[in-house]
């Protein structure tokens, strides 16, 4: 197994959630770190852990971002990090299934991500690069993110399911 560190300049952790039951709000976290331990051919047996700085949330709307940082949602002052610690990764056809423990607001729940291994290459400066994409879905209420507003149409302002996406490039540690 080889250790890799995330190249933050070429990586992104994003999310999307239904808004008013008719559209989606997308955002990302601009400050995060991840470590990967993997063999060089594929992700079999890999360990992938990541840590996100909650205060770095960015939906391109300052008022919304501040609300998301508040105690109504992530309570970034009390719970400054979101973490994921891998338990297992298994090959499923051409992709992988990554399972582990996701902690948001001090609440830890199992989470599963579908992972696509992009492969390995060498950049123009001679540095090895591996890349992969991952997608998962969690129910925000499972992590104490319960704020919402009822709509006159009978729906709610914020959907329960949050789709999480990772686009990661890593270099040897």
How does the language model describe each region?
Residues 1-173:
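Low-complexity, acidic/polar, glycine-enriched regions of mature
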């Amino acid at each position: 197994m080889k250790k890799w560190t995330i190249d933050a300049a070429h990586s992104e952790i994003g999310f999307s959630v239904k808004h008013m039951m008719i559209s989606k709000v997308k955002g990302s976290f601009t400050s995060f770190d991840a470590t990967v331990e993997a063999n060089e051919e594929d992700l079999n047996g890999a360990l992938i852990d990541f840590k996100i700085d909650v205060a770095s949330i960015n939906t391109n709307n300052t008022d919304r971002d501040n609300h998301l940082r508040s105690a109504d949602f992530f309570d970034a002052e009390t719970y400054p990090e979101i973490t994921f610690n891998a338990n297992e990764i298994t090959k499923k056809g051409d992709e992988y299934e990554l399972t582990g423990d996701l902690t948001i607001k001090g609440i830890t729940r199992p989470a599963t991500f579908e992972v696509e291994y992009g492969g390995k290459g060498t950049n123009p400066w001679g540095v090895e690069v591996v890349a992969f994409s991952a997608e998962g879905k969690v129910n925000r209420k499972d992590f104490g993110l319960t704020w919402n507003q009822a709509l006159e149409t009978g729906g709610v302002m914020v959907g329960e399911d949050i789709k999480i996406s990772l686009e990661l490039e890593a270099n040897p540690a």
